[in-house]
């Protein structure tokens, strides 16, 4: 996978650097630019303020929150056909999240989604949707011009230039209507799949398409190919870009501290089986309910029998120093560090609301909701690339997959598993993709702007976690500086509240066409709000939040909680304005809106104040530094 080159802009020192993977395809996987094929977003989000003042969306509370949500959908889009998606859940803040998919002639409109958030009082809190409201075509199913699923697979392979051999493929009907599985395809990790769906095109019309799913390992693609003409209308990529001797939680990389021995580091309230059991089997290696970590030198898709360190006494202690070479000489330490960081983050996220019912990553959900059998597959020293990392997020019930690489910008080279910020960034892709639009709809950050925010959430969470006891709002942080052997890191600017160090604002996005650049703007805004809340409530430097009445008592964990809750509230493929409003709504639910002004001031400082707007006509953004009345 090719990297995205950015310019480091700390002070006056321009420098070309290699960033985390962009959306362009690796030559062993395909040969086209995926960014040019991203789906566009046409979602709208109606926040809690507008719901309270708009009588047209008033819906009385029904016996079950899903019935209340369905009544709202009927009121907003009368006459539309839709189905309830079975990943609805009640978050730990008491808000119920319900998801619907629009249908036509019994077929899904794959990018027409409706999410409804029901408050603790049983009434609608907020909602978002991208339902199609234009002229509905007659059924195409009797049209003899509709491609066969085999022809659609061939068309997708040729259009995306996938290294997929399908000469001897056989086709089997799957459980769903107009769904098929292709057996004996060579070059994919798993059998490709096809499903007949409608797709809303950017110009606002519907197309009947075959959705071809191909897991090529480096890219896990949903290709929407016209069911009659083989034109590609869009692509979604699921890949975004005991005792343990480790760099402890909060130590971002070897430049920040030293390894230490931690004993039984799990949080039993989040990992009831510890990190080395799944409730059925106990392990003496880096495998458990939340993750399975191993060496993957070939870069292949198999993992169950890969090398992983083991000790019958559960002493996961192996030597490492940054001066060791080659990387193979410290692979056990690398695997243990990756396993530790991913598990520690799982436990923190659990306390912040990313639980089984919300779609988290666990092999055994213990009847707590959601779909299980989906721990995170952690590949240390993955041999498929260098100086990168990525995370594949399929729907709930299918394992996530993180690949960590060796970074070759230094001598000796450096192992990305020892840079906690990179691991946390990648894992956060799984969080934001599972929470936005529902855990069964992993394509809800597929538009350019929403995909950019996906990168930004990863950077923000990694940065918030590494904040030190003596840090203040004047403290700035880069991303990936140690791994990349560059003090500037892998982003255009450091995360800072200073316009001198980081001049980005909302309208900066107008000139950006890459998700990592857009994500830097979003994470910068979140960093501003973070320090406003820390200044108000102080900062908890422990590894877990302290709650009072369900609310973190400090500003750092409060902001992280609001970010996680906001992901669950926002619509599929949100823009900056909608995601900001979702965070404001999350604060209303959690604290009664006590932090309204601190949140507004942080966003307004960077141009996302009251009146800031995103045009769906020309995709341009109008900035504003205005604050609402009362702030």
Curated annotation (Swiss-Prot):
Keywords: Glycoprotein, Hydrolase, Metal-binding, Metalloprotease, Protease, Secreted, Signal, Zinc, Zymogen. Zn(2+) binds at residues 425, 429. It is found in: Secreted. Transmembrane segments: none annotated. The gene is mep. Binds 1 zinc ion per subunit. The active site is at 426. One of its GO terms (biological process) is proteolysis. The lineage of its organism: Eukaryota, Fungi, Dikarya, Ascomycota, Pezizomycotina. Its EC number is 3.4.24.-. It comes from Aspergillus niger (strain ATCC MYA-4892 / CBS 513.88 / FGSC A1513). Glycans are attached at residues 282, 332, 364, 470, 505. Secreted metalloproteinase that allows assimilation of proteinaceous substrates. Residues 20-241 form a propeptide. Belongs to the peptidase M36 family. It comes from the Eukaryota. Its cofactor is Zn(2+). Residues 1-19 form the signal peptide. One of its GO terms (cellular component) is extracellular region. Pfam families: FTP, Peptidase_M36. This is Extracellular metalloproteinase mep. Coiled coil: none annotated. One of its GO terms (molecular function) is zinc ion binding. InterPro entries: FTP_domain, Fungal_virulence_M36, Peptidase_M36, Peptidase_M4/M1_CTD_sf.
């Amino acid at each position: 996978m090719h990297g995205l080159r950015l310019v480091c802009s700390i002070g006056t020192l321009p420098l070309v650097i290699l960033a985390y993977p962009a959306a362009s395809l690796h030559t062993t996987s395909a040969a086209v630019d995926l960014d040019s094929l991203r789906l566009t977003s046409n979602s709208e989000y109606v926040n809690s303020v507008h719901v309270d003042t708009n009588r047209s969306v008033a819906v009385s509370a029904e016996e079950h929150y899903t019935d209340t949500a369905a009544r709202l959908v009927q009121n907003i889009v009368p006459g539309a056909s839709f189905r309830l998606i079975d990943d609805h859940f009640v978050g730990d803040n008491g808000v119920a999240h319900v998801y619907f998919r629009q249908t036509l002639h019994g077929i899904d409109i794959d990018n027409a989604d409706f999410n409804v958030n029901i408050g603790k009082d049983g009434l609608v809190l907020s909602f978002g949707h991208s339902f199609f409201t234009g002229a509905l075509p007659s059924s195409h199913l009797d049209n003899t011009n509709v491609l066969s699923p085999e022809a659609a697979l061939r068309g997708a392979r040729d259009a995306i230039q996938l290294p997929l051999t399908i000469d001897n493929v056989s086709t089997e009907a799957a459980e769903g209507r107009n769904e098929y599985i292709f057996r004996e395809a060579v070059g994919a990790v798993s059998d490709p799949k096809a499903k007949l769906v409608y797709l809303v095109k950017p110009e606002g019309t519907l197309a009947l398409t075959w959705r071809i799913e191909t897991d090529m390992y480096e890219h896990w693609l949903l290709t929407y190919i016209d069911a009659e003409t083989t034109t590609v209308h869009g692509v979604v990529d699921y890949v975004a870009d005991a005792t343990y001797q480790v760099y402890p939680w909060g130590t971002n990389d070897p430049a920040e501290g030293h390894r230490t021995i931690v004993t039984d580091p799990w949080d039993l309230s989040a990992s009831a089986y510890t990190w080395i059991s799944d409730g059925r089997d106990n392990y003496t290696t880096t495998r458990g309910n939340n993750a399975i970590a191993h060496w993957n030198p070939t870069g292949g898709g198999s993992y169950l029998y890969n090398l992983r360190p083991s000790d019958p006494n559960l002493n996961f202690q192996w030597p490492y120093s940054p001066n060791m070479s080659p990387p193979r000489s410290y692979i056990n330490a690398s695997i243990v560090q990756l396993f530790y960081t991913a598990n520690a983050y799982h436990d923190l996220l659990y306390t912040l609301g990313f639980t089984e019912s919300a779609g988290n990553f666990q092999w055994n959900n213990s009847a707590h909701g959601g779909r299980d059998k989906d721990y995170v597959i952690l590949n240390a020293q993955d041999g498929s690339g260098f100086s990168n990392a990525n995370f594949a997020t399929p729907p709930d019930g299918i394992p996530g997959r993180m690949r960590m690489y060796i970074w070759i910008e230094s001598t000796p080279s450096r192992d990305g598993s020892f840079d906690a910020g990179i691991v946390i960034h990648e894992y956060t892709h799984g969080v934001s993709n599972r929470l936005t639009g529902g855990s069964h709809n992993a394509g809800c950050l597929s538009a350019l702007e929403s995909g950019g925010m996906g990168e930004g959430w990863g950077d923000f969470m990694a940065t918030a976690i590494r904040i030190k006891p003596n840090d203040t709002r004047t403290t700035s942080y880069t991303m990936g500086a140690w791994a990349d052997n560059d003090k500037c890191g892998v982003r255009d600017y450091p995360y800072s509240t200073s316009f001198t160090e980081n001049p980005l604002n909302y309208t900066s996005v107008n000139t950006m066409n890459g998700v990592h650049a857009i994500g830097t703007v979003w994470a910068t805004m979140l960093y501003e709000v973070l320090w406003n809340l820390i200044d108000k409530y102080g900062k908890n430097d422990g590894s877990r939040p302290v709650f009072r009445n369900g609310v973190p008592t400090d500003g750092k964990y409060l902001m992280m909680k609001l970010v996680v809750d906001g992901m669950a509230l926002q619509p599929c493929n949100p823009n900056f304005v909608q995601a900001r409003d979702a965070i404001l709504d999350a604060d209303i639910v959690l604290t009664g809106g006590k932090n309204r002004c601190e949140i507004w001031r942080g966003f307004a400082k960077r141009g996302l104040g009251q009146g800031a707007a995103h045009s769906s006509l020309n995709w341009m953004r109008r900035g504003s530094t205005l604050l609402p009345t009362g702030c």
